[in-house]
Amino acid sequence: MINPLSSAQLGKNMGKRMKFTGTKNYVATEDLTIAVNAAVTLERPLLIKGEPGTGKTELAKQVASGLGLEMLEWNIKSTTKAQQGLYEYDAVSRLRDSQLGEERVHDVANYIRKGKLWQAFEADKKVVLLIDEVDKADIEFPNDLLQELDKMEFHVYETGETVRAINRPIVIITSNNEKELPDAFLRR
């Protein structure tokens, strides 16, 4: 997702921005540091691919630690849908509550559970959002998140509101190379 920049190119863009240099418990290579800092500077997702157990998830944790940020982790499974990262609407509970005469039924927002992207978008401070093992999901999963990750916003159809990132999160996406990711996703 991010093409590494040279140290000189990255240095010009860093200014007073956050800069990851590793942590006392994690020594990052120069190439890895450049890739992370390019993603931070350009405010673009960083895709980390590699075999299981090679430290992809740990990198995200160390980036959060090194930059003094909270980390939100969205673990992807074969059944995960992109919509779950945004929000889930519980229509069944709302129907049940309407039959029971519950007052809360009048506000549809009472039946919306915020996903990890929504939580990251509304965080008061910048956070690191880890989307872990994206290749475990359906082949269309990554493409289903393209617009949300590009624009850092999404529409909640049930309430009519648009959720926009208050502070653009640092998005780190990991892949175990179990499946090929869509070209459109990789180009971004």
Where are these regions (language model features)?
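Short glycine-rich substrate-engagement loop in P-loop NTPases that contacts/grips substrate
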Residues: 86, 91-124
